[in-house]
Amino acid sequence: MYLRPIFLGIFSFLILTVGRGEMISPLKIPLLMSANFGELRPNHFHSGIDLKTQGRIGLPVYAMDDGYVSRVVVSPWGFGRAVYINHSSGLTTVYGHLDRFAPFIDEIVRRQQYEQEDFSIDCEFAEGEIPVAQGDIIGYSGNSGSSGGPHLHLDIRDTDTQDPMDPQEWLSPLITDDVAPEVRNLVFYTHEGVMGNTTRRMERKAVRASAGSY
């Protein structure tokens, strides 16, 4: 189900201004989603998509394009083990809930953990420190962090602003999806300022006029 949510708030009206270069799939299995971009969570919108890993841990995860590792996070919460890659296109791809990193990243992570004397780390790297090529294995899928089961969380962001973009804009031809969305309600959230005479959420019931029309 390919949802195109309208965000009146946290994401505002994000207009894509960067070119869409050719990206490859981060997984070499048929892509099935377990969560869409923009899904409403208890305290945030879902900033990416969740890709199923056939209920398995340890599938190779591939860099979607040339670039460099700009950030690596290890945490018992959030994305767990995560790799951030900056690309020359002005995009950043984020791969979350990894079971482990590729050896060339893991070596650096372990060194940082020993230096900081802490399991949890959040390290940033400059361009050229950890280069990657499209198709390089950067880690292996897992269930680390705040995850309810094995899957790969994938973000695509604007590097400069870190605004999230819908990964389906790049991957939709590869994602098996034949379930049409059903609109039930439209909910408005304010980000800054006032909406009408209120700053609270407003919800309106969607009335179906005909197939695909509300």
Where are these regions (language model features)?
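Bacterial N-terminal signal peptides that target proteins for export
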Residues: M1-F7
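Hydrophobic h-region of N-terminal signal peptides that target proteins for export
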Residues: I10-R20
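A short secondary-structure junction motif
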Residues: L40, F101-A102
